[in-house]
Amino acid sequence: MNKQDFYFDLPSELIAQYPLANRSDSRLLIYNRQTEEYGHYQFREIADFLQPGDLLVMNDSKVIPARLYGHKATGGKVELLVERITGDFTFLAHIKASKSLKSNDFIYLDAGKRLEVLERQDDLFLCKASENILDLLNDLGHIPLPPYIAREDESLDKERYQTVYAKCAGSVAAPTAGLHFDDAVLSSIRARGVNIAYVTLHVGAGTFRPVRCERIQDHKMHSEWFTVSPDLCAAVKAAKSMGNRVIAVGTTALRSLESAAMGGELIPCSRDTDIFIYPGYQFKVCDGLITNFHLPESTLVMLVSAFIGHQECMALYQEAIDKRYRFFSYGDASLLL
């Protein structure tokens, strides 16, 4: 298939620039693959469409304030986006500067703190901080909002560009399907008899990388680190053995589960994945998916197309546009069953 097969015209005013006042105020578009029927609801109603014994799998990765601003010894401005923390003091980052940096260059930050460039690794730079990098980011870092949110980060983003169950620090973009859940929704889901389990996948900046090749099969996915625990594997197997559904909360949870089952059986693992799911893929674990509405021609639209069918996906997105759903990270959600 070609990239343009996944194009749709999205009015710019449907790209959400801010979150709604309350997480669960988001709208929810439900699509049933068997009946091919749509339903329009509020996200707070989602428990009504889940069944006792269903297993929701959520990504508990926590967004780090990964954007830093500094300057070189010459005074030139430098902007960093931390891609991956590799040690207590070391990390890989994308760096924007008027002139490319080289090994042993220093980047000076506020409060007398500094970073040293150790080496270049392809498009990234390996750097060393003058103190624990997570502490430094928490002191000086900014929330790395996606490129389609056309504003600077604000104080509200520290809370709202984060799921309420985030635990494991490491993502530079939020697993956005989880942003709609608040404590009341989680309580209603548990009261319904639905089980919840967690995977960890640290979302990298590569999630925003566009598909540049015409044949989608030629696209090379970015790599992200994930963990599927023995407890999660046991929960999935228990649900499957009872004939219950496994529903991924977000494409990151789905990609983690499918990566861990690439050999045909779900196994515990902790490693990188560059799995690319597009039409023709045979799903091994997931029976349902909760996800936001994604960019035209993106790998995430291709994943949704693989899950519900290409024509069905394009029709679903047209339905969302016609009904004025909000798109992307701070937008509305869909439940695909």
Swiss-Prot record:
Gene Ontology terms describing biological process: queuosine biosynthetic process; tRNA wobble guanine modification
Cleavable signal peptide: none
Location(s) in or outside the cell: Cytoplasm
CC per GO annotation: cytoplasm
Catalytic activity: 7-aminomethyl-7-carbaguanosine(34) in tRNA + S-adenosyl-L-methionine = epoxyqueuosine(34) in tRNA + adenine + L-methionine + 2 H(+)
GO molecular function annotations of the record: S-adenosylmethionine:tRNA ribosyltransferase-isomerase activity
InterPro entries referenced in this protein's UniProt entry, alphabetically: QueA, QueA_dom1, QueA_dom2, QueA_sf
Pathway: tRNA modification; tRNA-queuosine biosynthesis
Main enzyme class: transferase
EC number: 2.4.99.17
One Pfam match: Queuosine_synth
Job description of the protein: Transfers and isomerizes the ribose moiety from AdoMet to the 7-aminomethyl group of 7-deazaguanine (preQ1-tRNA) to give epoxyqueuosine (oQ-tRNA).
Family of the protein in this entry: Belongs to the QueA family.
Protein name per the record: S-adenosylmethionine:tRNA ribosyltransferase-isomerase
Biological source species: Legionella pneumophila (strain Corby)
